[in-house]
């Protein structure tokens, strides 16, 4: 298959070279993020590959349809940037990478929890200013805390296994689909019970219409005073304005955001010399007890390699069978 890969980072190039040969593809790589303005570049190709922050709206999909594109493979698990109704209408088959390295996100989540509970980022900022005092840096020990995991699939399970080594006081979780393996470590509770009982709440659920802004004013009010919130899943699971109010009131002791609801066009881009227009993000950055990372929980050498390989495997399967096990939209 002849493929155009958009938004290719330098760290992906070797994997594309190696796996394109393995799966019999001809792949051209460009750094441009996919969107309506560059969709015309797909002319002459059979399929394209994109990333999760690319703009895959109706306009862009119609343009690649006019270019003859039948297959679209995102190198991510998340697909919230893709207009599925338009893809189906235009006969474009879509596939994703449902699991590239659950360990990468789970390890990062544990790191975020330690960063919050031990105030590591705040301490680092103070040291940069030659402030070596201990005042304001006292932390809490994980073994005295209850962990609440929302979403216990592949990544959530690895998160649970990772925290189990710290001897947490208790581990509880919520998922509409209970994981039998997770039951070896956690007790399943209702969502309200997780909000009420957990000292650390970590999110590992996909974004759906039903859980949009699940962490909002009402749910935060149900939480313990001094709760820590971690989001290494999808940004729009959290209502950012409600989060800010919770931080200002002291209800929330700290938040770690590797995903942010308005991250598209910002995360994974260098904005150092630009005036930031997102006042909400700027307010979140101003809190000393908020850790923001640019959606890099997935970002390990193994995960990047797997993302590229599974993407090219998906496109090979489309070419040979007309369908794919990781297909998200049927023609």
UniProtKB/Swiss-Prot annotation:
Pfam families listed in its UniProt record: 2-Hacid_dh, 2-Hacid_dh_C
Disruption phenotype: Mutants are deficient in reductive metabolism of phenylalanine, tyrosine and tryptophan, and exhibit growth defects when cultured with amino acids as the sole carbon source.
UniProt source species: Clostridium sporogenes (strain ATCC 15579)
PANTHER family assigned to the protein according to its UniProt record, in alphabetical order: 2-HYDROXYACID DEHYDROGENASE HOMOLOG 1-RELATED
Domain of life according to the entry: Bacteria
Protein family membership: Belongs to the D-isomer specific 2-hydroxyacid dehydrogenase family.
Pathway field: Amino-acid degradation
Lineage: Bacteria, Bacillati, Bacillota, Clostridia, Eubacteriales
Protein EC: 1.1.1.110
Identification of the protein by name: Aromatic 2-oxoacid reductase
pH dependence: Optimum pH is 7.0 for indolepyruvate reduction. Optimum pH is 8.5 for indolelactate oxidation.
